[in-house]
From Swiss-Prot:
GO molecular function, a single term: structural constituent of ribosome
Organism annotation: Staphylococcus epidermidis (strain ATCC 35984 / DSM 28319 / BCRC 17069 / CCUG 31568 / BM 3577 / RP62A)
HAMAP family: Ribosomal_bL20
GO BP: ribosomal large subunit assembly; translation
One of the record's GO cellular component terms: ribonucleoprotein complex
Pfam families registered for this protein in UniProt: Ribosomal_L20
Name of the protein described by the UniProt record: Large ribosomal subunit protein bL20
Protein family according to the UniProt entry: Belongs to the bacterial ribosomal protein bL20 family.
Function: Binds directly to 23S ribosomal RNA and is necessary for the in vitro assembly process of the 50S ribosomal subunit. It is not involved in the protein synthesizing functions of that subunit.
Recorded name of the encoding gene: rplT
Record's signal peptide: none
Length: 118
């Protein structure tokens, strides 16, 4: 039985890694060994940051809501507590969008939250 060296498989695997490393700086997009390490590290960063992104957006929404709420003389925590007591079920993403785009509607929500707190 003849010996099989597997050259095509090896070349294909290496080409795939180099292709994934496209756009990397220096030898990281040309040398296989370094490219392989960087592609693995990039995957780790991507995995971590997909989770981080969710936290970052939530933080951003809360900051926006707090800024808009303070213009109406109420803190973020009191606003959220008031909305909960008024049984207004609206998520932070939508609330921040309303705060940015529709000040009238946000003012209405704030007034209902203030009423519920009394």
């Amino acid at each position: 039985m003849p010996r099989v060296k597997g050259g095509t498989v090896t070349r294909a695997r290496r080409k795939k890694t180099i292709k994934l490393a496209k756009g990397y700086f220096g030898s990281k997009h040309t040398l296989y060994k370094v490219a392989k390490q960087q592609v693995m590290k990039s995957g780790q960063y991507a995995f971590r940051d997909r989770r981080q992104r969710k936290r970052d957006f939530r933080k951003l929404w809360i900051t926006r809501i707090n800024a808009a709420a303070r213009q109406h003389d109420i803190s973020y925590s009191r606003l959220m507590n008031g909305l909960k007591k008024a049984e207004i079920d609206i998520n932070r993403k939508m609330l921040s969008e309303i705060a940015i785009s529709d000040d009238k509607a946000f003012a209405e929500l704030v007034s209902k939250a203030k009423e519920a707190l009394k």
